[in-house]
């Protein structure tokens, strides 16, 4: 149906007879014109009839409601009045202020008859001017602008459009923000945006619509238009080469036609044997990738589908074609032997077989036969086979599923096994490292071998030798009442006296506020504590270890022999007097050395730490700092030049001693034999001014962790009394006799042998008694000389030094009982007064062998 957009004004003379399809505006304008002309006409009925006569509807226009027609006047006057009214109406059209408006409406009417294209791109490409604009207002037929927003959309009017966007290829010389007049035959809404496909007119800024405007709301029209209106975007289609396909009867096959280029998007058509193919039950035409390709698909290909196919692509710029073939192979069947004489049926007999069966004509018998597809059988493939005959075997699917499950479970098990192996390896490695760490710590805590034990000393940390208390250790030969428990006492040192060559040097001895209640080691017996501790470190606790080697057994036998010899001598000896090793808790005793060298777990010693805080201590360190031994410091050292030579015996000053010496007798013979060993040139007996050797008979080598040059030695001197006896007072004789009994010894580097200790004891006993068995004393002296000669080899040079000092040096020690300790002068007086009171009760030494 065609639609004509007409103006509200009367048409020009050439267009007389055209009418408007919109009668509401024309009728209203006719009524206004008739009412205006009724003032000059004869009657209103004649004017209405004239206006009605001017409104003639075409058959193509939709039916419009028309007013009831009045009967025409038959009189000539009425006819003349009607003619005048028509002339007045014609004169109103000629007075239109817009003379080009009729041209615009004529163009709009032509635009409405233009055929619509399928693609928006086609419309944009064919339209001379394409802009995006916004409707600002609608101009009614009277020429006044419509400002009412509630007015319904008007059609057949001129719209005032503001240009918002344009495309360079189709701009038509327009600029943005420019207002143009557009005549449209479709309803337009005010303040709405449209894409206008326009054609220019004779009037500037006046356009007519080539295609219906498109609303841009909710559509991607601008993008589609931009794809075709860009520079060098529009191209004719160009198709790719089509691939030929080969398939079996009943299979699904397809032919693909794809465009390599083409803008706007081309449309596709398929042809076979010059005939266009359309969609059917067996053939489908599909498009893909935004209609860039087309696919001709056969659901079940047949033998008759084989042939040549043509694909044609076309757009507004041109078209292109491509060709391809489809080959269909018949499936081999179990026909009889005469199948070699069969041929395909003609086109007229192909419909003999149904359900996709292929028809064959068997020559000789002139009979048609069908090759049925899977699932059908019979003469014409009418019967359908059971589903189980042509469907896949469910057992096969179950077998495949089972295999997949087995593979999955196997993979999981292998993964778990690998994880377990990794965990076990990590655990074993960690355990090995932990074991190595424990072994290392155990080696650091416990001695690994004998040398380390000797070097590191006791296993208890930071032990002060002064704090060793001999508790729970009962000697075999000493009664329980004779054991002494060491108590903590306050010890003071007095070092106010200075040393000089003519003055006797002595060292301060510790004094106790309760001397009658506690028995402590005097400094004269304990000042060589550091040396004994260092030598004790080198001694191993052989008594507590297992003895399996021959050397160990031999050493134990020797110690047992020495022990028996000492026991026999002690049994025949007179009452005990003080000697070097007489005190049970002396640093020179076997118990003390054994306590230092025995591990803490086997030692019968209780350790107490009561060292005064004001007395600094020092440590004997070893490579293993955990076994360092802390020792108390020595007293301040002040000694003479002559005392710097360690373990050298100096002759006593010539002249009478303070008391009578040992008279002729067995004791004197033993003394002479003792002195004759060390001083062969001195004569048969000890001369005046000679010094007895005392208790220092030799020492073991120094500890490998102690530098002997750093030790501060102290010399012990014992001056033998003059041979001629003199009558003295009782107290003086006691003081004099106490002299040879109190052997002086230096700081030892090792432990004296048993035989040397026995010799010293026997000498002390014989000299204290004054008259004993001469034969026994001589034998003991000979044994002692042998022992001394065996253990004094490190000091063979003592004789020369003694002779030189005896001949050239002045007397360095008095005849009285004195010891050259470094800074105490009150020691000799205290010692003499103590000995004058009488010998203390003898405390037997430990009879157990080392």
UniProtKB/Swiss-Prot annotation:
Glycans are attached at residues 52-53, 147, 278, 346. The chain crosses the membrane at residues 406-426. Disulfide bonds join 257-311, 345-359, 353-370, 372-381. Direct ligand for ERBB3 and ERBB4 tyrosine kinase receptors. Concomitantly recruits ERBB1 and ERBB2 coreceptors, resulting in ligand-stimulated tyrosine phosphorylation and activation of the ERBB receptors. May also promote the heterodimerization with the EGF receptor. This is Pro-neuregulin-2, membrane-bound isoform. The cytoplasmic domain may be involved in the regulation of trafficking and proteolytic processing. Regulation of the proteolytic processing involves initial intracellular domain dimerization. Residues 112-405 are extracellular. Residues 60-74, 651-665 have a biased composition (Pro residues). Residues 237-332 form the Ig-like C2-type domain. Residues 427-850 are cytoplasmic. Residues 341-382 form the EGF-like domain. Residues 1-111 form a propeptide. The gene is NRG2. Residues 1-96, 492-535, 566-585, 647-681, 700-788, 801-850 are annotated as: Disordered. Keywords: Cell membrane, Disulfide bond, EGF-like domain, Glycoprotein, Growth factor, Immunoglobulin domain, Membrane, Secreted, Transmembrane, Transmembrane helix.
